[in-house]
Curated annotation (Swiss-Prot):
Full protein name: Chaperonin GroEL, chloroplastic
Source organism of the structure: Guillardia theta (Cryptophyte)
Pfam families, sorted: Cpn60_TCP1
Enzyme's top EC category: isomerase
EC number from the UniProt entry: 5.6.1.7
Record InterPro entries: Chaperonin_Cpn60_CS (IPR018370), Cpn60/GroEL (IPR001844), Cpn60/GroEL/TCP-1 (IPR002423), GroEL-like_apical_dom_sf (IPR027409), GROEL-like_equatorial_sf (IPR027413), TCP-1-like_intermed_sf (IPR027410)
Upper classification of the organism: Eukaryota, Cryptophyceae, Pyrenomonadales, Geminigeraceae, Guillardia
Length: 529
Protein backbone atom coordinates (compact mmCIF):
# COMPACT_ATOMS: atom_id res chain seq x y z
CA UNK A 1 0.00 0.00 0.00
CA UNK A 2 1.34 3.45 -0.88
CA UNK A 3 2.15 5.92 1.92
CA UNK A 4 1.73 9.62 2.57
CA UNK A 5 4.76 11.36 4.11
CA UNK A 6 4.42 14.73 5.86
CA UNK A 7 7.33 16.78 7.23
CA UNK A 8 7.91 19.39 9.95
CA UNK A 9 5.12 21.94 10.42
CA UNK A 10 2.64 20.04 8.21
CA UNK A 11 3.22 16.88 10.26
CA UNK A 12 2.78 18.61 13.60
CA UNK A 13 -0.30 20.56 12.49
CA UNK A 14 -2.01 17.36 11.28
CA UNK A 15 -1.38 15.71 14.66
CA UNK A 16 -2.64 18.84 16.41
CA UNK A 17 -5.97 18.76 14.52
CA UNK A 18 -6.64 15.22 15.73
CA UNK A 19 -5.69 16.16 19.28
CA UNK A 20 -8.04 19.17 19.26
CA UNK A 21 -10.98 16.92 18.38
CA UNK A 22 -10.22 14.37 21.09
CA UNK A 23 -9.38 16.94 23.79
CA UNK A 24 -12.64 18.82 23.19
CA UNK A 25 -14.76 15.65 23.35
CA UNK A 26 -13.09 14.53 26.59
CA UNK A 27 -12.75 17.85 28.40
CA UNK A 28 -16.49 18.63 28.34
CA UNK A 29 -16.79 16.00 31.12
CA UNK A 30 -14.32 17.70 33.50
CA UNK A 31 -15.47 18.96 36.90
CA UNK A 32 -18.74 18.79 38.85
CA UNK A 33 -20.59 20.66 36.11
CA UNK A 34 -19.03 18.66 33.28
CA UNK A 35 -21.49 17.21 30.76
CA UNK A 36 -21.97 13.64 29.58
CA UNK A 37 -21.01 12.12 26.22
CA UNK A 38 -23.23 9.65 24.35
CA UNK A 39 -21.46 6.77 22.59
CA UNK A 40 -23.29 5.01 19.77
CA UNK A 41 -23.18 1.22 19.88
CA UNK A 42 -23.50 -1.12 16.88
CA UNK A 43 -25.64 -3.41 19.05
CA UNK A 44 -27.88 -2.48 21.96
CA UNK A 45 -28.58 0.86 23.59
CA UNK A 46 -26.19 3.83 23.30
CA UNK A 47 -23.88 4.31 26.29
CA UNK A 48 -23.85 7.57 28.25
CA UNK A 49 -20.46 8.16 29.91
CA UNK A 50 -18.55 10.71 31.92
CA UNK A 51 -15.23 8.89 31.88
CA UNK A 52 -12.31 10.33 29.89
CA UNK A 53 -10.56 7.13 28.88
CA UNK A 54 -13.77 5.41 27.72
CA UNK A 55 -14.54 8.36 25.42
CA UNK A 56 -10.94 8.48 24.17
CA UNK A 57 -11.04 4.78 23.23
CA UNK A 58 -14.15 5.33 21.10
CA UNK A 59 -12.84 8.13 18.88
CA UNK A 60 -11.65 7.05 15.42
CA UNK A 61 -11.32 9.72 12.70
CA UNK A 62 -11.65 9.29 8.96
CA UNK A 63 -8.41 11.15 8.24
CA UNK A 64 -5.50 8.74 8.98
CA UNK A 65 -3.07 11.49 9.95
CA UNK A 66 -5.46 13.22 12.36
CA UNK A 67 -6.27 9.79 13.77
CA UNK A 68 -2.58 9.37 14.64
CA UNK A 69 -2.86 12.51 16.80
CA UNK A 70 -5.92 11.03 18.50
CA UNK A 71 -4.07 7.77 19.18
CA UNK A 72 -1.07 9.57 20.71
CA UNK A 73 -3.09 11.62 23.17
CA UNK A 74 -5.31 8.62 23.92
CA UNK A 75 -2.13 6.96 25.18
CA UNK A 76 -1.73 9.64 27.87
CA UNK A 77 -5.25 8.85 29.11
CA UNK A 78 -4.96 5.07 29.03
CA UNK A 79 -1.48 5.02 30.65
CA UNK A 80 -2.81 7.18 33.51
CA UNK A 81 -5.77 4.83 33.80
CA UNK A 82 -3.41 1.82 34.02
CA UNK A 83 -1.22 3.40 36.71
CA UNK A 84 -3.72 5.27 38.86
CA UNK A 85 -7.15 4.17 37.58
CA UNK A 86 -8.46 7.74 37.42
CA UNK A 87 -7.46 11.26 36.27
CA UNK A 88 -7.67 10.42 32.57
CA UNK A 89 -9.52 13.60 31.59
CA UNK A 90 -6.96 15.75 33.44
CA UNK A 91 -4.10 13.96 31.63
CA UNK A 92 -5.77 14.61 28.25
CA UNK A 93 -6.36 18.32 29.00
CA UNK A 94 -2.76 18.76 30.21
CA UNK A 95 -1.23 16.97 27.20
CA UNK A 96 -3.33 19.05 24.82
CA UNK A 97 -2.36 22.33 26.54
CA UNK A 98 1.36 21.45 26.48
CA UNK A 99 1.27 20.58 22.77
CA UNK A 100 -0.64 23.80 21.93
CA UNK A 101 1.90 25.94 23.82
CA UNK A 102 4.88 23.99 22.46
CA UNK A 103 3.76 24.13 18.80
CA UNK A 104 3.95 27.95 18.88
CA UNK A 105 7.54 27.82 20.18
CA UNK A 106 8.66 25.15 17.68
CA UNK A 107 7.08 27.18 14.83
CA UNK A 108 8.96 30.26 16.07
CA UNK A 109 12.27 28.37 15.78
CA UNK A 110 12.87 26.93 19.27
CA UNK A 111 14.97 23.75 19.46
CA UNK A 112 12.48 20.90 20.01
CA UNK A 113 15.02 18.67 21.82
CA UNK A 114 15.90 21.43 24.30
CA UNK A 115 12.17 22.07 24.83
CA UNK A 116 11.72 18.37 25.58
CA UNK A 117 14.51 18.48 28.18
CA UNK A 118 12.92 21.54 29.78
CA UNK A 119 9.51 19.84 29.91
CA UNK A 120 11.04 16.74 31.53
CA UNK A 121 12.96 18.74 34.16
CA UNK A 122 9.88 20.84 34.98
CA UNK A 123 7.74 17.72 35.32
CA UNK A 124 10.26 16.12 37.67
CA UNK A 125 10.27 19.28 39.82
CA UNK A 126 6.45 19.30 40.04
CA UNK A 127 6.34 15.57 40.91
CA UNK A 128 8.70 16.12 43.87
CA UNK A 129 6.61 19.14 44.97
CA UNK A 130 3.39 17.07 44.84
CA UNK A 131 5.05 14.41 47.03
CA UNK A 132 6.12 17.11 49.53
CA UNK A 133 2.67 18.69 49.79
CA UNK A 134 0.73 15.38 49.90
CA UNK A 135 -0.99 14.54 53.19
CA UNK A 136 -1.32 10.90 54.26
CA UNK A 137 -4.86 9.48 54.39
CA UNK A 138 -5.58 8.89 58.05
CA UNK A 139 -9.32 8.61 58.49
CA UNK A 140 -12.47 7.28 56.87
CA UNK A 141 -13.67 10.83 56.13
CA UNK A 142 -10.76 11.51 53.76
CA UNK A 143 -11.33 8.17 52.00
CA UNK A 144 -15.02 8.92 51.50
CA UNK A 145 -14.21 12.43 50.16
CA UNK A 146 -11.75 11.06 47.57
CA UNK A 147 -14.26 8.42 46.47
CA UNK A 148 -17.12 10.97 46.25
CA UNK A 149 -15.13 13.29 43.97
CA UNK A 150 -14.12 10.44 41.65
CA UNK A 151 -17.65 9.06 41.45
CA UNK A 152 -18.85 12.45 40.14
CA UNK A 153 -19.60 14.17 43.49
CA UNK A 154 -21.79 11.33 44.70
CA UNK A 155 -21.54 11.47 48.52
CA UNK A 156 -23.47 8.22 49.07
CA UNK A 157 -21.04 6.30 46.86
CA UNK A 158 -18.11 7.84 48.74
CA UNK A 159 -19.50 6.65 52.07
CA UNK A 160 -20.14 3.17 50.68
CA UNK A 161 -16.56 2.76 49.44
CA UNK A 162 -15.17 4.11 52.73
CA UNK A 163 -17.34 1.52 54.56
CA UNK A 164 -16.08 -1.24 52.27
CA UNK A 165 -12.43 -0.32 52.91
CA UNK A 166 -13.18 -0.14 56.65
CA UNK A 167 -14.49 -3.69 56.59
CA UNK A 168 -11.96 -5.43 54.33
CA UNK A 169 -8.93 -3.32 55.25
CA UNK A 170 -6.73 -1.27 52.94
CA UNK A 171 -5.33 -4.35 51.23
CA UNK A 172 -8.79 -5.91 50.89
CA UNK A 173 -10.71 -6.73 47.74
CA UNK A 174 -13.72 -4.70 46.56
CA UNK A 175 -15.59 -6.20 43.63
CA UNK A 176 -18.44 -4.77 41.53
CA UNK A 177 -21.51 -6.74 40.51
CA UNK A 178 -24.66 -5.77 38.64
CA UNK A 179 -27.47 -5.64 41.21
CA UNK A 180 -31.04 -6.78 40.79
CA UNK A 181 -32.71 -3.58 42.06
CA UNK A 182 -32.40 0.17 41.45
CA UNK A 183 -30.51 0.69 44.73
CA UNK A 184 -26.72 0.33 45.01
CA UNK A 185 -25.85 -1.77 48.07
CA UNK A 186 -22.75 -2.99 49.86
CA UNK A 187 -22.50 -6.61 50.90
CA UNK A 188 -19.73 -8.42 52.78
CA UNK A 189 -19.08 -11.98 51.66
CA UNK A 190 -16.57 -14.65 52.46
CA UNK A 191 -14.03 -14.69 49.74
CA UNK A 192 -10.40 -14.44 48.86
CA UNK A 193 -8.12 -13.12 46.16
CA UNK A 194 -4.81 -14.70 45.11
CA UNK A 195 -2.13 -13.63 42.64
CA UNK A 196 -2.57 -16.13 39.83
CA UNK A 197 -4.64 -15.62 36.68
CA UNK A 198 -5.97 -17.72 33.79
CA UNK A 199 -3.46 -19.98 32.01
CA UNK A 200 -4.74 -19.18 28.49
CA UNK A 201 -6.48 -16.06 27.10
CA UNK A 202 -8.88 -18.36 25.20
CA UNK A 203 -10.81 -18.75 28.47
CA UNK A 204 -11.78 -15.04 28.58
CA UNK A 205 -15.54 -14.38 28.74
CA UNK A 206 -15.43 -10.54 28.77
CA UNK A 207 -13.06 -9.52 25.97
CA UNK A 208 -13.34 -5.78 26.63
CA UNK A 209 -11.96 -6.12 30.17
CA UNK A 210 -9.98 -9.35 29.52
CA UNK A 211 -11.68 -11.16 32.40
CA UNK A 212 -13.27 -14.53 33.03
CA UNK A 213 -16.46 -14.20 35.09
CA UNK A 214 -18.23 -17.38 36.21
CA UNK A 215 -21.41 -17.46 38.27
CA UNK A 216 -22.16 -20.44 40.52
CA UNK A 217 -19.21 -22.58 39.32
CA UNK A 218 -17.83 -25.90 40.54
CA UNK A 219 -14.16 -25.74 41.62
CA UNK A 220 -11.68 -28.58 41.11
CA UNK A 221 -8.64 -28.23 43.40
CA UNK A 222 -5.57 -30.40 42.88
CA UNK A 223 -1.88 -30.16 43.79
CA UNK A 224 -0.68 -32.16 40.77
CA UNK A 225 0.00 -31.43 37.11
CA UNK A 226 -2.86 -32.41 34.81
CA UNK A 227 -1.26 -34.24 31.88
CA UNK A 228 -3.39 -37.23 30.83
CA UNK A 229 -6.48 -36.24 28.88
CA UNK A 230 -8.29 -39.61 28.83
CA UNK A 231 -7.77 -40.70 32.43
CA UNK A 232 -7.64 -37.36 34.31
CA UNK A 233 -9.64 -34.78 32.40
CA UNK A 234 -12.44 -36.47 30.48
CA UNK A 235 -14.21 -38.09 33.49
CA UNK A 236 -14.37 -34.66 35.19
CA UNK A 237 -15.58 -32.83 32.07
CA UNK A 238 -18.29 -35.47 31.51
CA UNK A 239 -19.48 -35.06 35.11
CA UNK A 240 -19.66 -31.27 34.76
CA UNK A 241 -21.33 -31.23 31.32
CA UNK A 242 -24.32 -33.07 32.84
CA UNK A 243 -24.81 -30.28 35.43
CA UNK A 244 -24.47 -27.46 32.80
CA UNK A 245 -22.60 -25.36 35.39
CA UNK A 246 -19.17 -23.73 34.84
CA UNK A 247 -15.96 -25.34 36.10
CA UNK A 248 -12.82 -23.68 37.51
CA UNK A 249 -9.72 -25.89 37.67
CA UNK A 250 -7.03 -24.77 40.13
CA UNK A 251 -4.03 -27.07 39.61
CA UNK A 252 -0.23 -26.98 39.87
CA UNK A 253 -0.16 -26.79 36.06
CA UNK A 254 -2.02 -28.01 32.98
CA UNK A 255 0.12 -29.57 30.23
CA UNK A 256 -0.26 -28.55 26.57
CA UNK A 257 -2.47 -31.42 25.40
CA UNK A 258 -4.79 -31.19 28.40
CA UNK A 259 -4.97 -27.39 28.04
CA UNK A 260 -5.88 -27.75 24.35
CA UNK A 261 -8.71 -30.14 25.33
CA UNK A 262 -10.06 -27.58 27.83
CA UNK A 263 -9.86 -24.72 25.31
CA UNK A 264 -11.65 -26.74 22.60
CA UNK A 265 -14.44 -27.70 25.04
CA UNK A 266 -14.78 -24.05 26.07
CA UNK A 267 -14.83 -22.66 22.51
CA UNK A 268 -17.36 -25.25 21.32
CA UNK A 269 -19.61 -24.44 24.26
CA UNK A 270 -19.57 -28.00 25.65
CA UNK A 271 -18.24 -27.03 29.10
CA UNK A 272 -17.68 -23.48 30.34
CA UNK A 273 -14.26 -24.12 31.88
CA UNK A 274 -11.21 -22.11 32.97
CA UNK A 275 -7.84 -23.28 34.32
CA UNK A 276 -5.74 -21.38 36.87
CA UNK A 277 -2.33 -22.26 38.33
CA UNK A 278 -2.41 -22.81 42.09
CA UNK A 279 -0.89 -20.00 44.21
CA UNK A 280 2.32 -20.37 46.24
CA UNK A 281 5.06 -23.03 46.14
CA UNK A 282 5.75 -26.37 47.82
CA UNK A 283 4.07 -26.88 51.18
CA UNK A 284 2.62 -23.36 51.11
CA UNK A 285 0.83 -24.22 47.87
CA UNK A 286 -0.83 -27.22 49.55
CA UNK A 287 -1.85 -25.10 52.54
CA UNK A 288 -3.35 -22.39 50.29
CA UNK A 289 -5.25 -25.00 48.27
CA UNK A 290 -6.66 -26.32 51.55
CA UNK A 291 -7.70 -22.77 52.51
CA UNK A 292 -9.58 -22.47 49.19
CA UNK A 293 -11.12 -25.93 49.75
CA UNK A 294 -12.45 -24.90 53.18
CA UNK A 295 -13.78 -21.61 51.78
CA UNK A 296 -15.60 -23.35 48.91
CA UNK A 297 -16.63 -26.55 50.71
CA UNK A 298 -14.56 -28.85 48.48
CA UNK A 299 -11.59 -31.20 48.83
CA UNK A 300 -8.04 -30.97 47.51
CA UNK A 301 -7.52 -33.90 45.12
CA UNK A 302 -4.10 -34.99 46.35
CA UNK A 303 -2.38 -38.35 46.17
CA UNK A 304 -1.13 -37.75 49.75
CA UNK A 305 -4.76 -37.97 50.90
CA UNK A 306 -5.51 -40.96 48.66
CA UNK A 307 -7.66 -39.08 46.12
CA UNK A 308 -7.16 -39.16 42.35
CA UNK A 309 -8.79 -37.44 39.38
CA UNK A 310 -9.90 -40.79 37.92
CA UNK A 311 -12.21 -41.46 40.91
CA UNK A 312 -13.54 -37.91 41.26
CA UNK A 313 -17.17 -37.35 42.34
CA UNK A 314 -19.22 -34.13 42.35
CA UNK A 315 -19.25 -33.81 46.15
CA UNK A 316 -15.44 -33.48 46.13
CA UNK A 317 -15.69 -30.24 44.12
CA UNK A 318 -15.92 -26.84 45.78
CA UNK A 319 -18.63 -24.31 44.91
CA UNK A 320 -18.70 -20.51 44.84
CA UNK A 321 -21.21 -17.79 44.16
CA UNK A 322 -18.97 -16.06 41.68
CA UNK A 323 -15.37 -16.16 40.49
CA UNK A 324 -13.61 -13.35 38.61
CA UNK A 325 -10.26 -14.14 36.98
CA UNK A 326 -7.93 -11.64 35.27
CA UNK A 327 -4.48 -12.19 33.78
CA UNK A 328 -2.90 -11.68 37.23
CA UNK A 329 -5.55 -12.32 39.90
CA UNK A 330 -8.37 -14.66 40.88
CA UNK A 331 -11.16 -13.48 43.21
CA UNK A 332 -13.43 -16.12 44.72
CA UNK A 333 -16.71 -15.04 46.32
CA UNK A 334 -18.12 -17.93 48.36
CA UNK A 335 -20.94 -18.23 50.86
CA UNK A 336 -22.28 -20.55 53.52
CA UNK A 337 -19.10 -22.00 55.05
CA UNK A 338 -18.60 -19.49 57.86
CA UNK A 339 -18.08 -22.04 60.64
CA UNK A 340 -15.34 -23.94 58.78
CA UNK A 341 -13.62 -20.71 57.71
CA UNK A 342 -13.60 -19.41 61.31
CA UNK A 343 -12.05 -22.61 62.68
CA UNK A 344 -9.43 -22.57 59.88
CA UNK A 345 -8.57 -18.94 60.80
CA UNK A 346 -8.17 -19.97 64.45
CA UNK A 347 -5.84 -22.76 63.37
CA UNK A 348 -3.68 -20.31 61.35
CA UNK A 349 -3.60 -17.89 64.32
CA UNK A 350 -2.31 -20.67 66.56
CA UNK A 351 0.38 -21.47 63.97
CA UNK A 352 1.41 -17.80 63.95
CA UNK A 353 1.80 -17.82 67.75
CA UNK A 354 3.82 -21.05 67.65
CA UNK A 355 6.11 -20.00 64.79
CA UNK A 356 9.54 -18.55 65.62
CA UNK A 357 10.55 -17.62 62.05
CA UNK A 358 9.58 -14.07 61.05
CA UNK A 359 9.33 -15.10 57.36
CA UNK A 360 7.01 -17.98 58.27
CA UNK A 361 4.88 -15.66 60.43
CA UNK A 362 4.61 -13.13 57.59
CA UNK A 363 3.43 -15.80 55.15
CA UNK A 364 0.88 -17.16 57.66
CA UNK A 365 -0.33 -13.60 58.29
CA UNK A 366 -0.85 -13.21 54.51
CA UNK A 367 -2.90 -16.40 54.41
CA UNK A 368 -4.98 -15.27 57.38
CA UNK A 369 -5.66 -11.87 55.78
CA UNK A 370 -6.73 -13.54 52.53
CA UNK A 371 -9.06 -15.95 54.31
CA UNK A 372 -10.47 -13.74 57.08
CA UNK A 373 -10.58 -10.42 55.23
CA UNK A 374 -13.41 -11.45 52.98
CA UNK A 375 -14.51 -9.54 49.90
CA UNK A 376 -16.70 -6.44 49.81
CA UNK A 377 -19.20 -6.69 46.96
CA UNK A 378 -20.86 -3.51 45.72
CA UNK A 379 -24.07 -4.40 43.90
CA UNK A 380 -24.66 -1.59 41.43
CA UNK A 381 -28.33 -0.67 41.11
CA UNK A 382 -29.84 1.32 38.23
CA UNK A 383 -33.12 1.76 36.39
CA UNK A 384 -31.72 1.09 32.90
CA UNK A 385 -28.74 -0.73 31.41
CA UNK A 386 -27.28 2.56 30.15
CA UNK A 387 -27.31 4.04 33.66
CA UNK A 388 -25.87 0.80 35.04
CA UNK A 389 -22.81 0.99 32.74
CA UNK A 390 -22.21 4.65 33.61
CA UNK A 391 -22.50 3.93 37.35
CA UNK A 392 -20.11 0.98 37.12
CA UNK A 393 -17.47 3.13 35.38
CA UNK A 394 -17.80 5.85 38.03
CA UNK A 395 -17.59 3.34 40.87
CA UNK A 396 -14.52 1.76 39.30
CA UNK A 397 -12.84 5.18 39.13
CA UNK A 398 -13.78 5.85 42.75
CA UNK A 399 -12.34 2.54 44.01
CA UNK A 400 -9.11 3.09 42.04
CA UNK A 401 -8.77 6.69 43.25
CA UNK A 402 -9.26 5.59 46.84
CA UNK A 403 -6.54 2.96 46.58
CA UNK A 404 -4.22 5.53 44.96
CA UNK A 405 -4.93 7.98 47.83
CA UNK A 406 -4.04 5.37 50.44
CA UNK A 407 -0.75 4.69 48.59
CA UNK A 408 0.65 8.20 48.08
CA UNK A 409 -1.59 10.58 50.06
CA UNK A 410 -3.93 13.40 49.04
CA UNK A 411 -3.62 16.96 47.72
CA UNK A 412 -6.21 19.74 47.15
CA UNK A 413 -8.41 18.78 44.17
CA UNK A 414 -10.24 20.60 41.40
CA UNK A 415 -7.03 21.49 39.53
CA UNK A 416 -5.89 23.81 42.35
CA UNK A 417 -2.71 21.86 43.29
CA UNK A 418 -1.24 22.24 39.80
CA UNK A 419 -2.32 25.91 39.66
CA UNK A 420 -0.49 26.71 42.93
CA UNK A 421 2.61 24.79 41.85
CA UNK A 422 2.78 26.83 38.60
CA UNK A 423 4.21 29.79 40.62
CA UNK A 424 6.84 27.59 42.31
CA UNK A 425 7.81 26.12 38.93
CA UNK A 426 8.26 29.55 37.35
CA UNK A 427 10.61 30.72 40.13
CA UNK A 428 12.59 27.45 40.08
CA UNK A 429 12.90 27.40 36.26
CA UNK A 430 14.10 31.02 36.04
CA UNK A 431 16.82 30.26 38.62
CA UNK A 432 17.94 26.88 37.22
CA UNK A 433 17.31 26.74 33.45
CA UNK A 434 18.35 28.83 30.45
CA UNK A 435 17.34 29.42 26.82
CA UNK A 436 15.09 26.80 25.20
CA UNK A 437 15.10 24.55 28.28
CA UNK A 438 13.62 27.47 30.24
CA UNK A 439 10.98 27.91 27.51
CA UNK A 440 10.17 24.17 27.82
CA UNK A 441 9.64 24.55 31.58
CA UNK A 442 7.45 27.63 31.02
CA UNK A 443 5.32 25.60 28.57
CA UNK A 444 4.57 23.24 31.48
CA UNK A 445 4.01 26.22 33.83
CA UNK A 446 1.39 27.74 31.50
CA UNK A 447 -0.28 24.35 30.98
CA UNK A 448 -0.67 23.62 34.71
CA UNK A 449 -3.65 25.95 34.99
CA UNK A 450 -5.50 24.26 32.08
CA UNK A 451 -7.47 21.66 34.14
CA UNK A 452 -8.75 24.37 36.51
CA UNK A 453 -9.49 26.68 33.56
CA UNK A 454 -11.57 23.96 31.91
CA UNK A 455 -13.43 23.12 35.15
CA UNK A 456 -14.38 26.81 35.52
CA UNK A 457 -15.36 27.15 31.83
CA UNK A 458 -17.63 24.09 32.16
CA UNK A 459 -19.54 26.02 34.86
CA UNK A 460 -19.95 29.01 32.51
CA UNK A 461 -17.75 31.42 34.54
CA UNK A 462 -14.81 33.59 33.46
CA UNK A 463 -11.67 31.66 34.37
CA UNK A 464 -8.94 34.35 34.21
CA UNK A 465 -9.97 36.29 37.35
CA UNK A 466 -10.59 33.17 39.46
CA UNK A 467 -7.24 31.59 38.49
CA UNK A 468 -5.36 34.77 39.49
CA UNK A 469 -7.17 34.85 42.86
CA UNK A 470 -6.23 31.22 43.54
CA UNK A 471 -2.59 31.71 42.49
CA UNK A 472 -2.25 34.48 45.09
CA UNK A 473 -3.85 32.40 47.88
CA UNK A 474 -2.53 29.73 50.26
CA UNK A 475 -1.86 26.21 48.92
CA UNK A 476 -5.07 24.76 50.43
CA UNK A 477 -7.31 27.31 48.70
CA UNK A 478 -9.12 26.35 45.49
CA UNK A 479 -12.35 26.80 43.54
CA UNK A 480 -15.49 24.84 44.45
CA UNK A 481 -17.06 24.68 40.97
CA UNK A 482 -20.30 23.12 42.24
CA UNK A 483 -21.06 26.16 44.45
CA UNK A 484 -19.03 28.78 42.57
CA UNK A 485 -16.96 29.76 45.65
CA UNK A 486 -13.28 30.01 46.55
CA UNK A 487 -12.80 27.74 49.58
CA UNK A 488 -10.30 25.72 51.65
CA UNK A 489 -10.28 22.46 49.67
CA UNK A 490 -9.39 20.23 52.64
CA UNK A 491 -12.26 21.67 54.72
CA UNK A 492 -14.93 21.05 52.08
CA UNK A 493 -13.44 17.69 51.03
CA UNK A 494 -12.45 18.48 47.42
CA UNK A 495 -9.31 16.36 47.36
CA UNK A 496 -7.45 14.28 44.78
CA UNK A 497 -5.02 11.39 45.27
CA UNK A 498 -1.44 12.62 44.80
CA UNK A 499 -0.76 9.56 42.62
CA UNK A 500 -3.53 10.52 40.17
CA UNK A 501 -2.30 14.12 39.88
CA UNK A 502 1.32 12.99 39.51
CA UNK A 503 0.78 10.26 36.91
CA UNK A 504 -1.60 12.46 34.87
CA UNK A 505 1.09 15.13 34.61
CA UNK A 506 3.92 12.66 33.86
CA UNK A 507 2.02 10.92 31.05
CA UNK A 508 0.84 14.23 29.56
CA UNK A 509 4.40 15.58 29.54
CA UNK A 510 5.73 12.36 28.00
CA UNK A 511 3.24 12.42 25.10
CA UNK A 512 3.59 16.20 24.57
CA UNK A 513 7.39 16.05 24.36
CA UNK A 514 7.16 13.16 21.87
CA UNK A 515 4.78 15.13 19.62
CA UNK A 516 6.88 18.31 19.78
CA UNK A 517 9.98 16.39 18.64
CA UNK A 518 8.13 14.87 15.65
CA UNK A 519 9.59 15.91 12.28
CA UNK A 520 7.91 13.44 9.94
CA UNK A 521 4.77 11.27 9.75
CA UNK A 522 4.31 8.24 7.52
CA UNK A 523 0.73 6.96 7.13
CA UNK A 524 -1.14 4.71 4.70
CA UNK A 525 -2.73 6.49 1.76
CA UNK A 526 -6.51 6.25 1.93
CA UNK A 527 -8.30 4.47 -0.88
CA UNK A 528 -10.44 6.72 -3.02
CA UNK A 529 -13.98 5.40 -2.83
Amino acid sequence: MSKIILYQEDARRALERGMDILAEAVSVTLGPKGRNVVLERKYGAPQIVNDGVTIAKEIELEDHIENTGVALIRQAASKTNDVAGDGTTTATVLAHAMVKQGMKNVAAGANAIALKRGIEKATQFIVTQIAEYARPVEDTRAISQVASISAGNDIETGKMIADAIDKVGREGVISLEEGKSTITELEMTEGMCFEKGFISPYFVTDTERMEVIQDNPYILLTDKKITLVQQELLPTLELISKTSRPLVIIAEDVEKEALATLVVNKLRGIVNVVAVRAPGFGDRRKAMLEDIAILTGGQVISEDAGFSLETLTLDMLGQARRITITKENTTIIAEGNEKDVKSRCEQIRRQIEASDSSYEREKLQERLAKLAGGVAVIKVGAATETEMKDKKLRLEDAINATKAAVEEGIVPGGGSTLTHLANDLKDWAEDNLIEDELIGALIVERSLTSPLRRIIENTGQNSAIIIEQIKESEFNIGYDAAKGEIVDMYDVGIIDPAKVTRSGLQNAASIASMILTTECIVVDKQDEK
